[in-house]
Amino acid sequence: MKLNIGINVFDAALNRLQELYEQDHTIVISQSGGKDSTVCMELAIMAADAAGKLPINVIHRDEEILFPNTYEYLDRVANRPEVNMHHVWAGQPVINVFNRSDPYWWIFDEQIPREEWVRQPPDYAYKIDEMNINALVTRDRFPTPEDKEIYACIGLRVQESPNRRMGLFSSKGHITKPNDRGVKYVRPIYDWTDGDVWKAIENFKWDYNHAYDVMVKHGRSKNQLRIAPLTMTQAGIKDLQLAQKAWPQWFDTVTHR
């Protein structure tokens, strides 16, 4: 059951983050290049600015293959003075559900010529050994005093699936228990709708991934806009079909890869 707590979702999300910054905890924004993590990042910049804690920590694990405009957007993020960007790559295997004979491919596979990669990691990116995505945010990578918490901020929203709603309920709030590395996850926009996300981006004139504009141009509705790896589930076929029309040269490069 939803409860009206007498505050709008924007102010509630901002308060959730500002409280953590004011307590001098370490907060790391997981930035995928998508709209939800973009909103989390912009809210974190506002909260950290109010608390005198700029720049904010942002991390992105490179997936090599995401829609065009995604990494151009992330380059702009990395160049912002309010952001301490950690752009990492791990060479992790990725499921390819469309190829039964060769069901995995590797991000920036060092066993093939670099020229065969869809794109190159940016100069400011660095390689990490940990392939487990839950190992991105650690106290070693983001030094944190022993008496303070470290949080990974993610753009989870319960509107997107019943499983996410149940996960939020089971953790009894927008902050999880610490994982095996002592990191808690904070989900400041869990109660936002798609409309809330786009309203904030429009009202505050925030920069965003312009791949979304291309998706809309090709008939995608607001609740169908997603930035995600393309080969991990059968749902990716619709994204590949869109890419074939929207970015034919890029699609050919991905197909060859």
Please provide the spans of the model-predicted regions:
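Nucleotide-activated chemistry modules centered on ATP-dependent adenylation/adenylyltransferase
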Residues: 1-30, 35-257
